[in-house]
């Protein structure tokens, strides 16, 4: 995914780079979108979440169906919020948001959300703000999110990491490592990387943090 214009390209590593064909433009996400910051896959589909253009609120969930070769997109899955985290499991897509949209416009929402999307019906099942014990501020930006080896959905809220049971939506563990300052990018997700050594590496608060 590229900025500007939220364009999605595919690259064949077995072929030489050709600026006209490899990478190949696959889709241009429309409806005033600019930054495709999160991608995941599942059920033979690619899911892309975006941040809108300057002066605009409301991101897009774009979906490519490999079986049909067709794209679809859905604006404002969470009203007036950008999608900055995606994770797939068992026919459901989990997304997380930032209250901020494009530059030059203040957010309308007060709390970031997690949403659950039914992949088979292309319908949102629910949205909610997780109750995170001990967090120092109301979440305004949640992401990245990722399923861990324990089956929980893990996520980051600025300086806090948490793990949520995807069935009950209960946050079963959390830890505030740094204060929530929100003094860097308001949409770029904090990374979560599950390593072969059993460690979880993150960039919460824009710092490299290793968690055992």
PLM regions and their residue ranges:
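Short loop/turn segments immediately following the C-termini of beta-strands
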Residues: 3-4, 13, 51-53, 98-101, ...
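A short loop-to-beta-strand structural motif that recurs across blades of beta-propeller domains
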Residues: 7-9, 59-62, 112-115, 160-162, ...
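Short, conserved, GDST-rich strand-edge loop motifs in beta-rich repeat architectures
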Residues: 48-58, 96-112
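Short loop/turn segments that connect beta-strands within beta-propeller blades
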Residues: 12-16, 65-69, 118-122, 165-169, ...
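Conserved beta-propeller blade signature
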Residues: 1, 45-49, 93-96, 152-155, ...
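Blade-level signature of beta-propeller repeat domains, shared across WD40, Kelch, NHL, RCC1
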Residues: 194-212
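Repeated scaffold domains used in trafficking and secretory/extracellular systems
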Residues: 31-41, 79-89, 135-146, 181-197
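Surface-exposed loop and turn segments in beta-propeller and other repeat-based domains
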Residues: 15-32, 71-81, 122-139, 175-185
């Amino acid at each position: 995914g590229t900025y500007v214009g939220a364009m999605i390209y595919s690259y064949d590593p077995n072929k030489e780079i050709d600026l006209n064909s490899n990478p190949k433009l696959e889709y241009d996400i429309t409806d005033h979108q600019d930054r495709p910051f999160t991608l995941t896959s599942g059920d033979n589909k690619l899911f892309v979440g975006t941040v809108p253009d300057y002066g605009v609120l409301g991101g897009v969930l774009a979906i490519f169906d490999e079986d049909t070769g067709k794209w679809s997109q859905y604006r404002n899955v969470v009203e007036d919020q950008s999608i900055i985290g995606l994770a797939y499991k068992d026919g459901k897509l989990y997304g997380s948001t930032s209250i901020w949209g494009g530059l030059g416009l203040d957010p309308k929402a007060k709390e970031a959300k997690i949403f659950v999307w039914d992949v088979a019906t292309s319908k949102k099942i629910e949205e909610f703000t997780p109750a995170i014990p001990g967090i120092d501020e109301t979440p305004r930006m949640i992401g990245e999110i990722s399923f861990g080896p324990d089956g929980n959905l893990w996520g980051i809220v600025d300086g806090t990491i948490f793990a949520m049971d995807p069935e009950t939506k209960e946050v079963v563990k959390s830890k505030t490592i740094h204060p929530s300052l929100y003094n860097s990018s308001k949409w770029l997700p904090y990374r979560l990387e599950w390593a072969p050594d059993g460690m979880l590496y993150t960039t919460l608060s824009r710092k490299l943090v290793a968690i055992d």
